[in-house]
Curated annotation (Swiss-Prot):
Miscellaneous note of the record: The fruit of cv. Royal Gala exhibits a high ester accumulation, whereas the cv. Granny Smith contains low ester levels; this influences strongly the ripe apple fruit aroma.
GO terms of biological process kind: alcohol metabolic process; fruit ripening, climacteric
UniProt key word Transferase: yes
Pfam families registered for this protein in UniProt: Transferase
The encoding gene: AAT1RGC
Physiological role: Involved in the biosynthesis of volatile esters which confer ripe apple fruit flavor. Alcohol acyl transferase that can use a wide range of alcohols as substrate to produce esters.
Broad EC category: transferase
Keyword Transferase tagged: yes
Keyword terms of this UniProt record: Transferase
Protein name as it appears in the record: Alcohol acyl transferase 1 allele RGc
Species whose genome carries this gene: Malus domestica
Length: 459
């Protein structure tokens, strides 16, 4: 395929999309999980679609999605409002129907020419999701920005940015599914959303009943190379975990342990160890890795409606000194991850809400020795069909400082998991070297395989 030299994206005037029908004018409180400091940011998501004339001949994706957005906002009308802050930093949404931001764009490039540049960390994100001045705040700003960019091949890219205080990944998926159903001609969403944020208010009186390492004040004893405030120092790359990498990692774990661990657990243990080595963290420093655990469903005993689209998760945290994490076999890190995840239940989530209220809605720990991982491989973004079939890729567009998202990705002929990482430039090369070392097949195994691949970094 012919590569493109300079991408030219033409944008039309920014619009405000309002609900298609009048909606309630009211004020709704966010939950005490929603409005914590650590969720007061915007999350970028990118979704890429091929042309599919057999399904949607002569249809304009911009027109279809614009109209579907407006109709879906009738049911998700709080997203068309604006946040305001009350006493004790309590967030609430003014459901005033002002609307979400929408922009139509076109680019002189095909999806094939873009290739891996649509994958996280998407180097063209600023072109496909332009940051309009003043649009990325938390209080008093639009809660959603959507840009639909039509490509010369007939395909298109839908990129969006959502205020994380309003919804998590499953909640956003409910909204996107509603838009997709409307785009395909439905009169109403198949799943009608519920607000009910009071279900995750703090208790009266609030009481902290669990240990929450994720919100502890931490003194950073590292060499200072990880300075998240200095974004010029940070670089992003994505790393692919396919069948070969997972096979090598599993061989390093005792049989009685591997039988009860998930792919997520194993990758998280691997990343935690390699990242700690790459950052050269002080051996006596406590290292933390938090796993975002969804509270929905029967597994964690949290009674929430399936139609709930607010934030319904916690990040239980594994803690270890850097020295044993680096020196012990991979199984040590794996056991830490499994034990941390096992602490998640309804009591844990209630205790988080109470802690946040009692301590003024604090930020989670933000030192370089801390990593947050979120499994989006089953979030369902790849099933969102606006009438052009399933997306070529759909998911978070990049890592966010300390946060890495696991996304499903097909590399050549196999399905695997892509993990974007954000690290200081000085540590990124060491991280890749450690990752290649820990996922390298022993020589005797390589001889037994016709083909061997290594960890792939995607710039």
């Amino acid at each position: 395929m012919m590569p493109f030299s300079v991408l030219q994206v033409k944008r039309l005037q920014l619009e405000l999309i309002t609900p298609a029908k009048p909606t309630l004018q009211e004020t709704k409180f966010l939950s005490d999980i929603d409005d914590q400091e650590g969720l007061r940011f915007q999350v970028p998501v990118i979704m890429c679609y091929k042309d599919n004339p057999s399904l949607n001949k002569n249809c304009n994706p911009v027109k279809v999605i614009r109209e579907a957005l407006s109709r879906a906002l009738v049911y998700y009308y709080p997203l068309a409002g604006r946040l305001k802050e009350g006493p004790n930093r309590k967030l609430m949404v003014d459901c005033n129907g002002e609307g979400i931001l929408f922009v139509e764009a076109s680019a002189d490039v095909t999806l094939e020419q873009l290739g891996d540049k649509i994958l996280p960390p998407c180097p063209l994100l600023e072109e496909f999701l332009f940051n309009f001045p003043g649009s990325d705040g938390i209080i008093g700003c639009p809660l959603l920005l959507v840009q639909v960019t039509c490509l010369t091949c007939g395909g298109f890219i839908l990129a969006l940015r959502v205020n994380h205080t309003m919804c998590d990944a499953p909640g956003l998926l409910l909204f996107l599914t509603a838009i997709a159903e409307m785009a395909r001609g439905a009169h109403a969403p198949s799943i009608l959303p519920v607000w009910e944020r009071e279900l995750l208010f703090s208790r009266d009186p609030p009481r902290i009943t669990c240990v929450h390492h994720e919100y502890e004040d931490v003194i950073d004893h590292s060499d200072g190379s990880y300075a998240s405030s200095n974004q010029s120092n940070m670089v992003q790359r994505s790393f692919y975990f396919g069948a070969k990498e997972m096979r090598v990692l599993r061989k390093q774990i005792p049989p009685h342990v591997i039988s009860t661990c998930s792919t997520f657990d194993l990758i998280t243990a691997c990343l935690s160890k390699c990242r700690t080595l790459a950052l050269k963290i002080n051996p006596k420093q406590a290292v933390r890795v938090s796993c975002v655990v969804n509270a929905r469903g029967k597994h964690h005993n949290v009674r929430l409606p399936l139609r709930y689209y607010g934030n319904a998760f916690a990040f239980p945290t594994a803690v270890s000194k850097a020295e044993p994490l680096c020196k012990n076999p991979l199984g040590y890190a794996l056991e830490l991850v499994k034990k941390a995840k096992a602490t998640m239940n309804e009591e844990y989530l209630r205790s988080v809400a109470d802690l946040l209220v009692l301590r003024g809605r604090p930020q989670y720990s933000s030192t370089g020795s801390y990593l947050i991982v979120s499994d989006n491989t089953r979030a369902g973004f790849g099933d969102v069909n606006f009438g052009w079939g399933q997306p070529v890729f759909a998911g978070p567009a990049k890592a966010l400082d300390l946060i890495s998202f696991y996304v499903q990705h097909k590399n050549n002929t196999e399905d695997g998991i892509l993990v974007p990482m954000c690290l200081p430039s000085s540590a990124m090369e060491r991280f890749q070297q450690e990752l290649e070392r820990i996922t390298q097949e022993p020589k005797e195994d390589i001889c037994n395989n016709l083909r061997s691949t290594r960890i792939m970094s995607m710039m």
